[in-house]
Amino acid sequence: MQSLVEAIKREGRVLPGGFLKVDGLVNHQLHPALTREMGETFARHFAPLAPTKVLTIEVSGIAPAIMTAAELGVPMVYARKKKPLTMSEQVYTAQSVSRTKGGTVDLFVSSEYLGPQDRVVVIDDFLASGGTLRSLSQIIADSGATLLGLGCVIEKEFEGGRQHLADLNVPIHTLANIVRMSEEEGIVVQAGR
């Protein structure tokens, strides 16, 4: 998605520790027109698979996921990082490692909103090592639903997440691909795949 690539070139920064700072685009501040285009692009890619649900994780995945779900005309469900008191007792859970939070995170999805009848596309903000997407795919498997594909706004190609998820045998679609990055060189980004 060329508009996203250009926005990353303009606004993205590399922080110490190998973190990509794009919070002015996808993690903290959002540009509605850009986010809408993300949803339209994902929807065009995944619509032929006939999904019935879009799944993501709170918080940063919600915006592109809801735009995708709106374009597809299906509900969007997000995995919670804490189980609220109001959530039903029957939940699907998985653990995920969060580099930005510095530890593991428990994920919860109510069985009320995900089950064997569902055909699911996962939309998230980043594909790095693939750990979060692996956790969401486990929740889908535990629910009996069918995983149709994975979509991520930004892929950090050099972290190998796509290869780590190859055994899921589903299409992986990204909108922007970080080929490499460093504090010295900056960000080398191209259209996703």
From Swiss-Prot:
GO cellular component terms, A-Z: cytoplasm
EC number: 2.4.2.22
GO biological process: purine ribonucleoside salvage; xanthine metabolic process; XMP salvage
Residues that hold 5-phospho-alpha-D-ribose 1-diphosphate according to the record: 128-132
Gene Ontology molecular function, alphabetical: xanthine phosphoribosyltransferase activity
Keywords: Cytoplasm, Glycosyltransferase, Purine salvage, Transferase
Entry keyword annotation includes Transferase: yes
Primary localisation category: cytoplasm
Any single Pfam family the record assigns to this protein: Pribosyltran
Keyword Transferase annotated: yes
Binding site for xanthine: 20, 27, 156
Organism domain of life: Bacteria
Pathway in which the depicted protein is active: Purine metabolism; XMP biosynthesis via salvage pathway; XMP from xanthine: step 1/1
Compartment annotation: Cytoplasm
Catalytic activity field: XMP + diphosphate = xanthine + 5-phospho-alpha-D-ribose 1-diphosphate
Function, as annotated: Converts the preformed base xanthine, a product of nucleic acid breakdown, to xanthosine 5'-monophosphate (XMP), so it can be reused for RNA or DNA synthesis.
Known partners and oligomeric status: Homodimer.
Entry similarity comment: Belongs to the purine/pyrimidine phosphoribosyltransferase family. Xpt subfamily.
Name the UniProt record assigns to this protein: Xanthine phosphoribosyltransferase
